[in-house]
Amino acid sequence: MALERTFSIIKPDAVAKNVIGAIYNRFESAGLRIVASKMLHLSKEQAEGFYAEHSERPFFGALVEFMTSGPVMVQVLEGENAVLKNREIMGATNPAEALAGTLRADYAASIDENACHGSDAPESAAREIAYFFSDEEICPRTR
């Protein structure tokens, strides 16, 4: 088993539903440790930069608008196989296809407002973590 870090966003729809604590509980109950966290209201530029890989997709404008519509929580999670574990906790991108008990099944209303984001690979996790956090902001949890 590999100790990994992954990146997670609790999106504006889930923040508005006041389920941040419930989501953090899911992370911790699954063995993931929160090693960095902050609430932000993304600027248009931040959202466009973060989702740049989707800039040519038809949903890009709506995605940026949604991600800037209210505050988000960004966090770094650490644990054994953290990337895969977080993706399992989140569930399918489309909440209609997400398994019961996953974050998206429980808290998302649609594929467009789907409650959370999680890195899809260790490489994207490293890039996404660096986008929002400096090394000094990450607090390894040794106890």
From Swiss-Prot:
Taxonomic superkingdom: Bacteria
Subcellular location, record wording: Cytoplasm
Listed InterPro entries: NDK-like_dom, NDK-like_dom_sf, Nucleoside_diP_kinase, Nucleoside_diP_kinase_AS
One example GO MF annotation: ATP binding
Xref: SMART domains: NDK (SM00562)
Keyword set, alphabetical order: ATP-binding, Cytoplasm, Kinase, Magnesium, Metal-binding, Nucleotide metabolism, Nucleotide-binding, Phosphoprotein, Transferase
Predominant location category: cytoplasm
List of catalytic residues: H117 (pros-phosphohistidine intermediate)
Residues the entry annotates as binding ATP: K11, F59, R87, T93, R104, N114
One of the Pfam families matching this protein, by short name: NDK
GO biological process, one term: CTP biosynthetic process
GO cellular component: cytoplasm
Reaction(s) the record says it catalyses: a 2'-deoxyribonucleoside 5'-diphosphate + ATP = a 2'-deoxyribonucleoside 5'-triphosphate + ADP; a ribonucleoside 5'-diphosphate + ATP = a ribonucleoside 5'-triphosphate + ADP
Cofactor(s) needed by this chain: Mg(2+)
EC number: 2.7.4.6
NCBIfam families: PRK00668.1
Record function comment: Major role in the synthesis of nucleoside triphosphates other than ATP. The ATP gamma phosphate is transferred to the NDP beta phosphate via a ping-pong mechanism, using a phosphorylated active-site intermediate.
Subunit and interaction comment: Homotetramer.
Family assignment from sequence similarity: Belongs to the NDK family.
This protein's name: Nucleoside diphosphate kinase
